[in-house]
A protein has these predicted regions:
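Soluble catalytic regions of membrane-associated enzymes that act on cell-envelope
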Residues: 1-239
């Protein structure tokens, strides 16, 4: 479909949904998501340090930002509406990405959005890119370093925002021997178990959150703006 719409020799495309991490290679498009025991380990670790989901021999298009979409030439983002069977996770389409084409197959509609910031296969860079050393647990700092090195600038593309308040409901913690903190329900007979964080940010900015762990488990995140939070008039929005 997209090869007919855009016959350019190289660009990447990704999807807001995943059936498996091998969707790109299985359906014939170039993406970030992939799993293989023969994959290049340094390349996987680089993607992991830039915020992408990672699991030993796979990487997945979860944890993306405007910066990484631009850097890795994610020119199109595919969304699926209607029949969402076999859809495991979902990434939100940024407002800046504009609908370019779509097609319907059965009761499912596939929509393709163009990323106006995709940088292409290659770009001119400052020599300092060769000196960048990525840290283990801060993808936002890493992205700041990469783009400042590419452009020869000293900007803060991502800035850390403080947590104003946090509350735990039915949550206990324990320290593991490797320094990690384990979170678990205090009372397993109670279904509700969560942590609330209150943060303050610019209303027209995007909020990103990174939860590093060596012990991969499912984790649901909901968000709510201040007005709805204070009066309880609207339910929280599921973020992933």
């Amino acid at each position: 479909m997209m090869k007919e719409y855009d016959p350019s020799l190289f660009y990447r495309m990704e999807a807001t949904f995943h059936r498996t991490v091998n969707d790109p290679i299985g359906t014939g498009y170039k993406g970030i998501s992939h799993s293989s025991s023969t994959m290049n380990a340094p390349a996987l670790m680089m993607l992991h340090k830039l915020g992408y989901a990672y699991g030993g021999h796979y990487t997945k298009y979860d944890g993306t930002t405007f910066m990484t979409d631009a850097l890795f030439d994610i020119k199109y983002l595919m969304d699926k509406t209607g029949n969402t069977s076999f859809v495991g996770t979902r990434v939100k389409v940024p407002e800046e990405y504009k609908l370019t084409t779509e097609y319907t197959e059965g009761d499912a509609t596939y929509k393709f959005y163009n990323n106006p910031n995709a940088l292409g296969l290659g770009m001119v860079s400052s020599p300092s890119i060769e000196d960048v050393s990525l840290s283990e647990d801060n993808p936002f700092e890493n992205q700041n370093m990469v783009f400042n090195a590419l452009a020869g600038t000293t900007k803060e593309y991502f800035t850390k925002i403080p947590v104003i308040n946090s509350e735990m409901e039915n949550v206990s913690t324990s320290q593991l021997t490797d320094g990690h903190t384990k979170y678990f329900p205090t009372d397993t007979s109670i279904a509700e178990c969560h942590i609330d964080y209150v943060v303050k940010m610019d209303k027209d900015s995007y909020l990103y959150m990174y939860l590093p762990t060596k012990y991969e488990r499912s984790c649901n995140v909901w968000i709510q703006d201040e007005d709805d939070y204070m009066d309880g008039s609207e339910p929280m929005e599921y973020a992933g």
